[in-house]
Amino acid sequence: MTDSTHPPFHNEPHGDSLGDRLNWLRAAVLGANDGIVSTAGIVVGVAGATDSRATLLTAGLAGLLAGSMSMAAGEYVSVSTQRDSEKAALALERRELREQPLEELEELTELLAARGLSEKVAREAAEQLTRRDALRAHASVELGIDPDALTNPWHAAGASFLAFTVGALLPLLAMVLSPLSLRLLVTVVSVLAALALTGWWSARLGAASVGPALLRNMGGGALAMGVTYAAGALLKAAGV
């Protein structure tokens, strides 16, 4: 009987933890991708208008800092909202367990039965889990939350800031460190190579086809650089 009560309660947090790790990794890849594309668009666009290394560096750094701070702030707000929702759900569950324990036991039994357990086994499992840790049982089975592993907005913000910054540094350094005659070529090639890598990672993490992911990622980056370079060149030709 003990074995039959383990899967619903103990296996789910492991699955959630794996899902959380994959979500963090996917977010890091996408953050780096955003840094690559947005900063590449900025420095290539400016390069279309001027050859000044100082101007390119200033524009690139401004874009890097603005983008990384925006990503971090957005992630902080988003994850803080999620954490508040998780806390509120746990508080409600705690109150319901205190005020109506029998109804909550019935609810847990029904949830376990819905996962394929017989009514008798589900009842026994629910009783054992309730005696062990009622809040944790309901949080895991009913809410899909680990009370000891709530999302951390500061970690999320820091990860987004770092991912975007790492991605943004590639086109910025390629542009300002390369010789003038090779500046655009080195930047475009390095950006497309990096986008191929992040596209491959995104496809692998999402169990999707690699080819279309590479085409979308590299095509989007190439389009961004082409449009911004054309805009910069037009401004230069207009004497702006």
List each language-model region with its residue ranges.
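Cytosol/matrix-facing amphipathic helices and coiled-coil assembly/linker segments
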Residues: 2-27, 79-161
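Internal alpha-helical transmembrane segments
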Residues: 2-78
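Transmembrane alpha-helical segments and their cytosolic interface motifs
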Residues: 24-43, 147-173
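Hydrophobic alpha-helical transmembrane segments
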Residues: 28, 56-61, 154-161, 184-189, ...
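C-terminal ends of transmembrane helices
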Residues: 76-80, 146-147, 199-209
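Small-residue-rich segments of transmembrane alpha-helices in multi-pass membrane proteins
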Residues: 167, 216-229
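Transmembrane alpha-helical segments of integral membrane proteins
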Residues: 170, 189, 193-208
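Juxtamembrane boundary at the C-terminal end of a transmembrane helix
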Residues: 229-240
